[in-house]
């Protein structure tokens, strides 16, 4: 009984070992088939692509190295028109060599003493092209030396507004005859500015501001006399004649006019002489003429 049981166990173990070995063999065959059928072809194609990339990069490196040695003057003399295609192809091939030996030989032949001379000739041609007067693209416009000097308006003449600037023809016609008139206008402008400064200072001292032009009822006599005197000076000639006629025609003003003459004749005090002038009423606005 013991021997029979031992033989059965040995047969079972032998069968199990055989089954496992068959599984291992099948797995190895599958791996070999996968490597030979799928992996090896892909590796071969990848190696071919890498070789092509290496060749292309080597050619590009040679091309970029030789671009600095290209002689444009020699290649510009290629035939144009009905020239054969082979000659054009040969000239273009000379620009981009296919091997390093040809590149070195071309660099030796191109680097000669005539290269600097050709560059100088090219620069001269370009310079003559840009300096050619017959080219319309680089023709500059005519520049005139005549002009008109504009006179800036006076900043103090704000009431009269901006005056029209005389044209060049008018200034040419007037000529040198306006020299004295210009001097008189400058003097009158200076006088006007000085009067305005005095009045603004008086107003600022009285009210603390130079923008107020309305007198107060409590203005002292000195201030009223000064304002009336400045208003009398700034009136125009025509306005002075009309005002004098109106004053002389008025019976009230005529009554005041006679005491003034008597005061001048009798040499009375300054207070009585100034009392004959017309004093502006409180609330009136005084306008100063700035006409030249």
UniProtKB/Swiss-Prot annotation:
Residues 265-275 have a biased composition (Acidic residues). InterPro entries: DASH_Ask1. Its main location: nucleus. One of its GO terms (biological process) is positive regulation of attachment of spindle microtubules to kinetochore. Residues 99-118, 149-194, 227-292 are annotated as: Disordered. The modification Phosphoserine is found at residues 26, 118, 134, 155-156, 200, 216, 250. The modification Phosphothreonine is found at residue 140. It is found in: Nucleus; Cytoplasm, Cytoskeleton, Spindle; Chromosome, Centromere, Kinetochore; Chromosome. Keywords: Cell cycle, Cell division, Centromere, Chromosome, Chromosome partition, Cytoplasm, Cytoskeleton, Kinetochore, Microtubule, Mitosis, Nucleus, Phosphoprotein. One of its GO terms (cellular component) is microtubule. Component of the DASH complex consisting of ASK1, DAD1, DAD2, DAD3, DAD4, DAM1, DUO1, HSK3, SPC19 and SPC34, with a stoichiometry of one copy of each subunit per complex. Multiple DASH complexes oligomerize to form a ring that encircles spindle microtubules and organizes the rod-like NDC80 complexes of the outer kinetochore. DASH complex oligomerization strengthens microtubule attachments. On cytoplasmic microtubules, DASH complexes appear to form patches instead of rings. Belongs to the DASH complex ASK1 family. Present with 2836 molecules/cell in log phase SD medium. Component of the DASH complex that connects microtubules with kinetochores and couples microtubule depolymerisation to chromosome movement; it is involved in retrieving kinetochores to the spindle poles before their re-orientation on the spindle in early mitosis and allows microtubule depolymerization to pull chromosomes apart and resist detachment during anaphase. This is DASH complex subunit ASK1.
């Amino acid at each position: 009984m013991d021997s029979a049981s031992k033989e059965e166990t040995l047969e079972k173990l032998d069968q199990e070992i055989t089954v496992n070995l068959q599984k291992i063999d099948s797995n190895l065959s599958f791996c070999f088939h996968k490597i030979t059928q799928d992996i090896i072809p892909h590796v071969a194609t990848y190696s071919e692509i890498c070789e092509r990339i290496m060749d292309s990069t080597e050619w590009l490196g040679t091309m970029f190295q030789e671009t600095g040695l290209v002689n444009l003057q020699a290649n510009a003399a290629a035939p144009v028109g009905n020239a054969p295609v082979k000659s054009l192809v040969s000239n273009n091939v000379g620009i981009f060599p296919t091997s390093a030996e040809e590149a070195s030989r071309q660099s030796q032949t191109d680097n000669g003493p005539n290269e600097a001379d050709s560059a100088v000739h090219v620069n001269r041609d370009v310079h003559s092209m840009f300096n050619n007067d017959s080219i319309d693209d680089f023709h500059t416009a005519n520049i005139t030396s005549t002009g008109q000097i504009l006179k800036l308006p006076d900043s103090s003449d704000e009431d009269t507004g901006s005056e029209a600037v005389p044209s060049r023809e008018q200034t040419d016609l007037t000529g040198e005859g306006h020299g004295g008139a210009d001097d008189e206008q400058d003097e009158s402008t200076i006088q006007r500015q000085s009067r305005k400064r005095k009045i603004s200072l008086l107003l600022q001292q009285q009210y603390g501001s130079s923008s107020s032009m309305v007198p107060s009822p409590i203005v002292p006599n000195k201030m009223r006399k000064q304002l009336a005197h400045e208003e009398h000076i700034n009136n125009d000639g025509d306005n002075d004649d009309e005002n004098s006629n109106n004053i002389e025609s008025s019976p009230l003003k005529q009554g005041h006019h006679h005491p003034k003459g008597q005061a001048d004749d009798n040499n009375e005090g300054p207070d009585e002489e100034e009392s004959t002038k017309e004093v502006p009423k409180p609330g009136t606005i005084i306008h100063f003429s700035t006409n030249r």
